[in-house]
Curated annotation (Swiss-Prot):
Note: Few gyrases are as efficient as E.coli at forming negative supercoils. Not all organisms have 2 type II topoisomerases; in organisms with a single type II topoisomerase this enzyme also has to decatenate newly replicated chromosomes.
Site label Interaction with DNA, positions: 450, 453
Organism: Vibrio parahaemolyticus serotype O3:K6 (strain RIMD 2210633)
Free-text comment on the cofactor: Binds two Mg(2+) per subunit. The magnesium ions form salt bridges with both the protein and the DNA. Can also accept other divalent metal cations, such as Mn(2+) or Ca(2+).
Subcellular location per the Swiss-Prot or TrEMBL entry: Cytoplasm
Name of the molecule in the record: DNA gyrase subunit B
Assembly with partners or alone: Heterotetramer, composed of two GyrA and two GyrB chains. In the heterotetramer, GyrA contains the active site tyrosine that forms a transient covalent intermediate with DNA, while GyrB binds cofactors and catalyzes ATP hydrolysis.
Sorted UniProt keywords: ATP-binding, Cytoplasm, DNA-binding, Isomerase, Magnesium, Metal-binding, Nucleotide-binding, Topoisomerase
Chain ranges of the Toprim domain: 419-534
Amino acid sequence: MSENYDSSSIKVLKGLDAVRKRPGMYIGDTDDGTGLHHMVFEVVDNSIDEALAGHCKDIVVTIHEDNSVSVSDDGRGIPTEMHPEEKVSAAEVIMTVLHAGGKFDDNSYKVSGGLHGVGVSVVNALSEKVVLTIHRGGHIHTQTYRHGEPEAPLAVVGDTDKTGTQIRFWPSAETFSNTEFHYDILAKRLRELSFLNSGVSIKLIDEREADKQDHFMYEGGIQAFVQHLNTNKTPIIEKIFHFDLEREDGISVEVAMQWNDGFQENIFCFTNNIPQRDGGTHLAGFRAALTRTLNSFMDKEGFSKKAKTATSGDDAREGLTAVVSVKVPDPKFSSQTKDKLVSSEVKSAVESAMGEKLSEFLVENPSEAKMVCSKIIDAARAREAARKAREMTRRKGALDLAGLPGKLADCQEKDPALSELYIVEGDSAGGSAKQGRNRKNQAILPLKGKILNVEKARFDKMLSSQEVATLITALGCGIGRDEYNPDKLRYHNIIIMTDADVDGSHIRTLLLTFFYRQMPELIERGYVYIAQPPLYKVKKGKQEQYIKDEEAMNQYQVSLALDNASLHVNAEAPALAGEALEKLVQQYNAGIKLADRMSRRYPRALVHELIYTSRLTAEQCHDAAAVEAWTKQLVEQLNAKEVGASQYSYEVELHAELGLSLPKIIVRTHGVTHEHALSVDFLNSKEYGKLADLSEVLDGLLEEGAYIKRGERTLPVSSFAEALEWLVKESMRGLSRQRYKGLGEMNPDQLWETTMDPETRRMMQVTIEDAVGADQLFTTLMGDQVEPRRHFIEENALKVANLDV
């Protein structure tokens, strides 16, 4: 360490170096996927700002096959003129200078989103490559950046009569530990944005899978959002309460809400289109006005007198779905990620607007007002009944925390952070778990049968369920709005351990429904896990081994197959064995698995045949004859191997503007024709690169007289696939394989060793990435309405390997 601390010790990070040095400050976590997806949102927010200013109608977000993302819009296009101070094009300034852009000039954008206020320059800094295309002033301008540095100045490459911007970026693997984009995370945010910006069309296209795209365009704005949130639920009143008010101080307040016959409160808050997960002053204002207005209306109309029970704000919000969206010129948030709004002036703005408009709505719609008041009174009565039920059970002593439920085998550890609670299905598995556990920090709670489906049950009915009451007591954090306190939780590791059969899956789903609906904070804090007991036990001779899943089973079979095996590529060649053969098998299996994954988008036979076809590079596509020869060879191989009803033909498409010829494979099956074009993105993708690498390894590997040997047995082979298949078949001789259905099939030692020992066990942590999606999924799968559930099963049945209905 340097002894001198002087002016030379002070480092000034110039330009975008600061972003690359500390990416988390600018974009969020670079390991868990949040930062990666924020890259897309930063670019989309620029297009949304154009839409807010009235210049943009269509936004298209595309996840390309090479895992790059492009965002294009039909806005005004980023200015291309020279910047007076920076002496480069304005577009280059926006791409390379932090905090540059139109948001800081109040005349360009009145309110703007942008999650971290740093914009597209951060995306540029954290990408291996960015291609910027601008349609503006009758010209198409383009510029390419690598790691934030422009390769050349902005150049004109053609003429156009359109306007708009397209930014395509390849995230840097040096910054992000995982560069795989999740469609659902992008879809959730883009859906929100389309609701919040009525009339803007947002398309999301995933080129990695066939026909996977969504078109989000909602004319109804946040009214349509509420309608969407209440899909598969039964509204109490058909009419959606809605107002949009712009105040003189520049704050605009928009609220939409509707009650349904459920028991959950669903309120989503936004400031300048940015979601606040933890609410803030706008939520406080909304809640205060809702409670005050409804209470005074019920007093005035005599509902409170008839009810004979006092109503609270919680009763008013039972079954309420609401979206609160405020536009604030200079919002203040509690942190950089803007999860909570702290601008004090917003509370009074929302409260006064909401109070005034809700009063008008109740007076002008007496029949709807009556239905809402009846629902609130019902909620108050149920709350009162639940309170009495709790008091009754307390008096009996069953729910008194001094006496924990008799079934619970508690642990000695008193620190919740170190304690684990295993929720086990059935008494037999419970017995094994109690004997096999580590008493110091592992508690066991066996549950008998299936617990109540809390999605369909009211609170008082839920409390009267014996299994639910046992679970609540064991957890120790109480339940219900008055008593629930997640900080009092007795175990910070709650592990659901059920059998690997249909009943086990059902019980696990019922438990997850309970946690999601009644104790969502436990999931949000990462306390809920699902145990992953082994699926198989294999026995060969006297050796026994546990195998966790199908993939591990395949790996085990391969390792067994390679034992004492050797491949001879011709009659005279030395044996290929040991590590060299293992490496080849691993590469082959990885290629086959990759081809299976790619066959979601392309025909399975086509993708698998690429493993046996020479590589076609993007550069070769400038030579039409080379593309013709490659495509012809591929199609001939496909037709030669086809045993079904499919016929293959091809075309070579000329893309004159790019100077490229690209292959198109045509598949005709039972008179139906499908065309599959192989794009430049496909040829440049990592996936195709891996298949082509494998094809180069296999090409010419086996010659005349090649054979495979295992022990003393041999077989002449003509392909590597044939050799591997024979090896696996040979290795399975004398092997018994037992599939575990229930945890009770294991003795205590086996259960400890495979599922409960912290050194060797595997667990899945339960998380919620898309709150709206999770809510809808629980409503569809666990709610009262049968039709949406049937539709869900029909749509997804083919995606499952083992379906039991």
